């Protein structure tokens, strides 16, 4: 796997360099980078101990013919024949509640691998775009780092107050049309956009019935955290930079944002506003 990892890393570095060099450019050709080695690396990065999806296939079963399975998957992607299966919905307790639950969508193992492969293509672009305040669902960033940054911001503030905002049921209500528009600002590769569209429309199986929501992205999907970060990068972070900052008497910084659900906080002083979020340990995590 070492050679595969090196090859993938080199390609990702090239994507990242181009994204940094051309921050307004939309990438039109990325899917060709996805070869068998890329899928092998995606498989290596995919959790193998999770529950099976609607097809019941486990990692052990898939790995018995891994090379053949990945080549078949790649062929279906390249030809456009890949069909995203429904996710299997289960409900887990929400936070520490004994009454509320959170719906989780469990993709098939093969879907997880392909979603991971697409995330590996998109992350080098969006990691150049995302703001320093965003900590949730990002590689190399943690709840503890968000908490420390939040504490530092509070200590540097001279008075003021903290405003907490809860974006309820964000995953369930994510607007597909707006998400597609945001994606196309940086990605216009037809293969990738069609794959993402298939995942958004794949449907949800629960109690033997399949439904097809016209909004949302299943919690539990490998690509869902990245899609949510892209959406909020434009809707929340972009709004703050574009519309809020210019109306403030003093300049301010969007300091810290932690996504575990979708709750964020704004630290406000007399003339300066910055929004932030800490970690679940401080009970200021975003609750989906």
Which residues are covered by each model-predicted region?
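Non-catalytic terminal/accessory segments
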Residues: 1-288
């Amino acid at each position: 796997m070492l050679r595969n990892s090196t090859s993938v890393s080199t390609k990702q570095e090239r994507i990242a360099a181009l994204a940094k060099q051309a921050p307004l450019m939309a990438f039109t050709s990325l899917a060709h980078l996805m070869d068998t080695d890329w899928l092998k690396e995606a498989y290596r990065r995919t959790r193998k101990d999770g529950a099976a999806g609607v097809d019941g296939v486990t990692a052990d079963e898939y790995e018995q013919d891994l090379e053949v399975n990945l080549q078949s998957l790649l062929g279906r992607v390249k030809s456009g024949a890949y069909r995203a299966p429904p996710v299997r919905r289960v409900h887990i307790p929400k936070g520490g509640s004994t009454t509320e639950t959170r719906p989780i969508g469990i993709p098939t193992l093969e879907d997880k691998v392909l979603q991971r492969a697409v995330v590996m293509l998109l992350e080098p672009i969006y990691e150049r775009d995302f703001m320093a305040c965003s900590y949730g669902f990002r590689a190399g960033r943690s709840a503890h780092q968000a908490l420390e940054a939040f504490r530092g911001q509070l200590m540097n503030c001279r008075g003021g107050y903290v405003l907490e905002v809860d974006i309820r049921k964000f995953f369930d209500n994510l607007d597909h049309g707006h998400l597609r528009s945001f994606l196309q600002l940086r990605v216009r590769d037809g293969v990738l956009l069609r794959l993402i569209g298939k995942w958004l429309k794949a449907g949800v199986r629960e109690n033997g019935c399949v439904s097809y929501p016209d909004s949302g992205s299943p919690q539990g999907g490998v690509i869902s955290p990245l899609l949510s970060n892209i959406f909020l990068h434009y809707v929340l972070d972009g709004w703050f930079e574009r519309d809020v900052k210019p109306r403030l008497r003093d300049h301010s910084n969007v300091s810290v944002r932690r996504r575990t659900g979708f709750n964020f906080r704004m630290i406000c002083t007399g003339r300066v506003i910055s929004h932030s979020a800490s970690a679940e340990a401080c009970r200021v995590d975003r609750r989906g």
